[in-house]
Structure formats: C-alpha cells, structure tokens
Swiss-Prot record:
Homodimer. Its EC number is 1.5.1.5, 3.5.4.9. It comes from Desulfatibacillum aliphaticivorans. Disulfide bonds: none annotated. This is Bifunctional protein FolD. It holds the Pfam family THF_DHG_CYH. One of its GO terms (molecular function) is methenyltetrahydrofolate cyclohydrolase activity. Belongs to the tetrahydrofolate dehydrogenase/cyclohydrolase family. The gene is folD. It comes from the Bacteria. Keywords: Amino-acid biosynthesis, Histidine biosynthesis, Hydrolase, Methionine biosynthesis, Multifunctional enzyme, NADP, One-carbon metabolism, Oxidoreductase, Purine biosynthesis. GO terms for cellular component: cytosol. One of its GO terms (biological process) is tetrahydrofolate interconversion. Catalyzes the oxidation of 5,10-methylenetetrahydrofolate to 5,10-methenyltetrahydrofolate and then the hydrolysis of 5,10-methenyltetrahydrofolate to 10-formyltetrahydrofolate.
C-alpha cells in the first residue's frame, strides 16, 4: 500500500489562508499591517526569481512589501547603512537580505547587522541561541525547519517519544530541526539522532527512525531498505539531476530529485513528502508566519 503523501503545496494554502485572515483582523484592530522588506543586491536570475516569489506571497497575505534593489557595486558600508535604516523603521517587521552577495561584501557581517527582532529568516546568532534554549525564548525558527515541523504536525504524525533521525548537519536545516524536535511541546518531545554522510553504518540509524528527515543534498541517498515500515519520511533534498522539456510550456526545465528513492520508499513508508511539491513550498510560507509574529511582538500582541 502506498504511503500517504504529505503535500507542502496543500499545507501552504491552508497556512496562507490563516495568515491572510489574521492580517485582515489585525488591520481592523490596529490600523496597521506587517511590513516585509527584501534587499536584492545585483541581478542574479535565481535570486530575482526567488525574491519575486517572496514579494508576491507577502502581497497576497496583505503585508506591506518592499523590494529594495541595489547595484552589485554597492559598498559594504552602504549596505550596512541601509539595513540600519530598516532596523529603525517601525513599519518594517521583517528584513531579508537575499544571498549570495557580491564577493566584496561579508555575508556574515551583513546578516548579523539585522535586528534579531526583525530577523524573520531566523539565522541571527541571537535567534539561534533562542532556538537552542527553546520554549518562550523562541521568536523565529528558521523557515525550512519550521515548515518541516508544521508538515509533521498537520499530517497527524505522533512526535512525542518518537525516534527521529535527521540525515544532515547544516545550520539551515539539519541542526535546527534536530533541536526543535527534541524540545518540549507540540510537534516535539522526540528522541533525536543526527547523522550525516560520514556516519558509520548510516543505513542502520535510518532503519530505526519513526520519523526520518533527510537533508543531505545527495540525490537518492536513502534506499527503501533503509526505511522502517510505516515511518514518516520527510525529504528536504532538491537536487537538479538533468533537464527536460515541459509538456505545458515547451521550454527546458530542471529535473529535480530528492535525497530519498521516492518511488520505492512510498511503498514502505507510512507517509512521505514528494519532490518537488513537498518541503519546498513551506519555506516562504513560514517566512510569512515569522513576519506576522514579528508584527505581533512589536505591537504587544504576543
């Protein structure tokens, strides 16, 4: 019997409807709406596309959205001054700096200059520390891990006491989702193991997982025999493995493959995310959730 599909596209729509409704209610109550600014340096095509999607989503849910495009020649000093301007703008609740930045600019210095209370990506060291402490200290969880946890909860997967194995140790996904799943609270209370591509007998670790979260960036890494029967499998990998011609547009598009052998795994797992259409749509969705939270914190509503 095939596994239940956990579709990020469906969950995204549920959450964005909830955010849109709450924004409308807050506007009626306070006369204000959340503000989100995305700073784009240069014209990297992938970055332009991603920023456009963020701005469109912010507009859809009723935010004030600003796309601040800057020349690739902007100095580090001027970019820091721009961030400082938005840090001190009460109408802005979320500040995003789209990466990658030009080589003459220090990414870490720029990202660390963002006010932690407006760091809706959740990557400022202050927010990383808050996440580690857990509980009421947490303001913004990083968007992809937050999306993963939300998918697990909304799919009705039991996490309390569950064996969770996270394959991958990045600061963006692996480490934060492991930390989130081990905390006290809904969607957590799990027993968590972090493994990676250098782990000895990786398959044996995966085989005992009730919830297997794979974020290694290796296409097809996890084989069906690595999966416990009935497990929940969250495939975070989005690996470009070739191109094909789209039947809809006739244009060349990327062929994407996850870190899990999906076709075989879905016959063993109890639930599984597809690639594409699984975890991917959740990242921008949770960015909207974090921006709404920031607005509520700023206005004494949380």
């Amino acid at each position: 019997m095939s596994a239940k599909l956990i579709k990020g596209t469906d969950i995204r729509e549920e959450i964005l409807e909830e955010v849109t409704k709450e924004v409308a209610e807050l506007k009626e109550k306070t006369g204000k709406v959340p503000g989100l600014v995305t700073i784009l340096v240069g014209e990297n095509p992938a970055s332009v596309s991603y920023v456009t999607l963020k701005i469109k989503t912010a507009h859809r849910v009723g935010f004030t959205e600003i796309q601040d495009n800057q020349s690739p020649d902007i100095s580090e000093e001027d970019l820091l001054a721009l961030i400082d301007k938005y840090n001190n703008d009460d109408s802005i609740n979320g500040i995003l700096v789209q990466l990658p930045l030009p080589k003459h600019i220090d990414d870490k210095k720029i990202l660390n200059a963002i006010d932690p209370d407006k760091d809706v990506d959740g990557f400022h060291p202050v927010n990383v520390g808050r996440l580690m402490i857990g509980g009421d200290e947490v303001k913004f969880a990083p968007c992809t891990p937050a999306g993963i946890q939300e998918m697990i909860v909304r799919a009705g997967v039991e996490t309390s006491g569950a064996e969770v194995v996270v394959v991958g140790r990045s600061n963006i996904v692996g480490k934060p989702i492991a930390n989130m799943m081990v905390q006290k609270g809904p969607g957590a209370n799990s027993t968590v193991t972090i493994v990676h591509t250098r782990t000895k007998d990786l398959a044996a670790h995966c085989q005992r997982a009730d919830i297997l979260i794979v974020a290694a960036g290796v296409p097809g890494l996890v084989k069906p025999e690595w999966i416990k029967k009935g497990a929940c499998v969250i495939d975070v990998g989005v690996n470009r493995v070739g191109t094909k011609i789209s039947e809809k547009t006739g244009k060349e598009i990327a062929v994407l493959r996850g870190d899990v052998d999906f076709d075989a795994a879905k016959e063993i797992a109890g639930s599984i995310t597809p690639v594409p259409g699984g975890v991917g749509p959740m990242t921008i969705t949770m960015l909207m959730v974090n921006t709404l939270k920031s607005f509520k914190f700023a206005n004494g509503l949380m």
